[in-house]
């Protein structure tokens, strides 16, 4: 004969209140310093202004309103933590934050990247975040230097300048 003893179940196996299924998770704020170019700071300000304007006429607490509020909290946080990095203009000896770096691949094709802040990065526009693998490999590089990453292969720095 089997007898069972009913003991309280461990809290680890009890699902806590999951909250509203439509609740949106907050956007992740990077723990890395929020370095931005002057253009990046302006873009963050425009983004915050745009979100505030779009939120103004929206009634209630629908999904769109909650998404806009979440995005506004994110970009207000990014704006508040922004550290503008000033850089030289014109030609430069070394690649640093804000630099536009001209590169040549082994096959002879050209590549141009700008080292920018995390929120400014847009690979399709040649803008790479300062903490990306490629940007970190480029930091301190000089004209004629060869850098290599797993994703890009070997690249030769052909020019460095600042906007």
Segments predicted by a language model, with ranges:
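Helix-rich terminal scaffold detector
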Residues: 1-78
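Charged, amphipathic alpha-helical segments
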Residues: 76-87
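Non-DNA-binding regulatory cores of transcription-related proteins
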Residues: 86-155, 161
């Amino acid at each position: 004969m089997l007898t069972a003893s009913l003991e309280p179940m461990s809290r680890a196996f009890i699902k806590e209140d999951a909250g509203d299924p439509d609740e949106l998770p907050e956007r992740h704020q990077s723990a890395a310093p929020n370095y931005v170019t002057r253009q990046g700071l302006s873009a963050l300000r425009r983004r915050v202004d745009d979100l505030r304007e779009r939120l103004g006429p929206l009634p209630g607490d629908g999904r769109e309103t909650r998404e806009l509020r979440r995005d506004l909290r994110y970009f207000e946080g990014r704006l508040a933590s922004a550290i503008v990095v000033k850089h030289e203009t014109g030609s430069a000896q070394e690649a640093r934050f804000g630099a536009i770096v001209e590169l040549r691949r082994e096959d002879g094709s050209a590549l141009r990247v700008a080292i920018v802040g995390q929120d400014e990065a847009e690979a399709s526009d040649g803008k790479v975040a300062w903490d990306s693998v490629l940007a970190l490999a480029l930091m301190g590089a000089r004209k004629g230097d060869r850098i290599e990453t797993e994703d890009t292969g070997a690249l030769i720095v052909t020019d460095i300048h600042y906007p």
